[in-house]
Amino acid sequence: MTTTLVSATIFDLSEVLCKGNKMLNYSTPSAGGCLLDRKAVGTPAGGGFPRRHSVTLPSSKFHQNQLLSSLKGEPAPTLSSRDSRFRDRSFSEGGERLLPTQKQPGSGQVNSSRYKTELCRPFEENGACKYGDKCQFAHGIHELRSLTRHPKYKTELCRTFHTIGFCPYGPRCHFIHNAEERRALAGGRDLSADRPRLQHSFSFAGFPSAAATAAATGLLDSPTSITPPPILSADDLLGSPTLPDGTNNPFAFSSQELASLFAPSMGLPGGGSPTTFLFRPMSESPHMFDSPPSPQDSLSDHEGYLSSSSSSHSGSDSPTLDNSRRLPIFSRLSISDD
C-alpha cells in the first residue's frame, strides 16, 4: 500500500516536471540538450513519458517547491522581492535608483510675468497669508515689482465699461475706466517726458565773442534752430577778448596792416578804413566778384539765344526786361554791343 502511494506520487511529480521541461525546451532550444537527457526515476519502461532536462532554472525550482509543499500540506513559498521585480517587465533595474531623485510636484514651477506685481488681498486685510513665502502676490510695498506695460496701455477708453457700466476685467483692464486712471497715466508720462534740451555751441570764424555767444544762446532755445549768429564787424572781431595777444602771436595783424595787404589785390583806395570795404554788402561792390569778359563767340551765341527766345514769345505779350534786375555781366555785355 505504501509502495503504491509512493510510486503514484513520483509519477505525478515526474509528469509535472516533464511538462515544465517541455516549455523550457521550446523557449531555449540548444544543440547539446539531448546529451543531457536522462530517464526519469520510477517511470514505467514502456510508458513513453517525455524526458526531463537535467539543468533547472529558478522558475523550475519554484514549481518543484510548490508541488512538494502542496503534497506535504505546507503553504507555497512566494518569490523573493528581487525575483518578482525582475519578472515584472514594467520595472527596470535602474528604476530603484531613479525613485528618490524624482521631483516633487510643484517644486519646479515657473513664476509668471505678473509675479509679485499686485498686493496680496488677504495679507492687506488680515495681516497674514496662509501661503506665506510661496504666495504669488506681494506682501507689502517692499515686495511689489513694476510691470512692463504696452506703450498704448491706458491710452483709450474702455468701450465695455463706458457702454454698460461694467467691465469683467476690473482693475486689470488695459483701457481707461475713469478720470483717475487717466490722471495717473498723464502724470507718469510728464515725468518721463522732461528731458534736458540739446545744447549747441557756435563759433563765428573760429573766434567767438561775448556778443556772438549771447546771440547764439538766444537763438538756440529750440534745438532745431539752425539760424547763424549775426555777422559782426571786423572791429568787433579784432577787439574780441578771445583773440590772441598781438605781442605773443606773430600772425596777429592790425587794421592798417590788413589794408596794406589787401589794397593792391582789390584795388582799394589809399585812404579810409579797410574794414568798411571788407565788410560791405555785395550789392555795393558788384565788380569785386565779376567774371572775366566772355570771348566773341560767346557773345554771338548769346545774341542767337535772345533772338530765338523773342521769336518764341511772338504770339503772346513779350516780357519786358528790367535793367536793374540784370546781372552786372549782362549789363557790361550790352554796353560793349552798343
UniProtKB/Swiss-Prot annotation:
Alphabetical UniProt keywords: Cytoplasm, Developmental protein, DNA-binding, Metal-binding, mRNA processing, mRNA transport, Nucleus, Phosphoprotein, Repeat, Ribonucleoprotein, RNA-binding, Transport, Ubl conjugation, Zinc, Zinc-finger
Post-translational modification: Phosphorylated. Phosphorylated by RPS6KA1 at Ser-334 upon phorbol 12-myristate 13-acetate (PMA) treatment; this phosphorylation results in dissociation of the CCR4-NOT deadenylase complex and induces p38 MAPK-mediated stabilization of the low-density lipoprotein receptor LDLR mRNA. Phosphorylated by protein kinase AKT1 at Ser-92 and Ser-203 in response to insulin; these phosphorylations stabilize ZFP36L1, increase the association with 14-3-3 proteins and mediate ARE-containing mRNA stabilization. AKT1-mediated phosphorylation at Ser-92 does not impair ARE-containing RNA-binding.
Segments of this protein annotated with the region Necessary and sufficient for the association with mRNA decay enzymes and mRNA decay activation: 1-111
Phosphoserine: residues bearing it: S54, S90, S92, S203, S318, S334
InterPro entries: Tis11B_N, ZFP36-like, Znf_CCCH, Znf_CCCH_sf
Compartments reported by the entry: Nucleus; Cytoplasm; Cytoplasmic granule; Cytoplasm, P-body
GO cellular component: cytoplasm; cytosol; nucleus; P-body; ribonucleoprotein complex
Low complexity composition bias: residue spans: 305-318
Classification via PROSITE patterns: ZF_C3H1
Main location class: nucleus
Protein's GO biological process: 3'-UTR-mediated mRNA destabilization; apoptotic process; cell population proliferation; cellular response to cAMP; cellular response to epidermal growth factor stimulus; cellular response to fibroblast growth factor stimulus; cellular response to glucocorticoid stimulus; cellular response to hypoxia
Record-level Gene Ontology MF annotations: 14-3-3 protein binding; DNA binding; mRNA 3'-UTR AU-rich region binding; mRNA binding; zinc ion binding
This protein's name: mRNA decay activator protein ZFP36L1
Source organism of the structure: Rattus norvegicus (Rat)
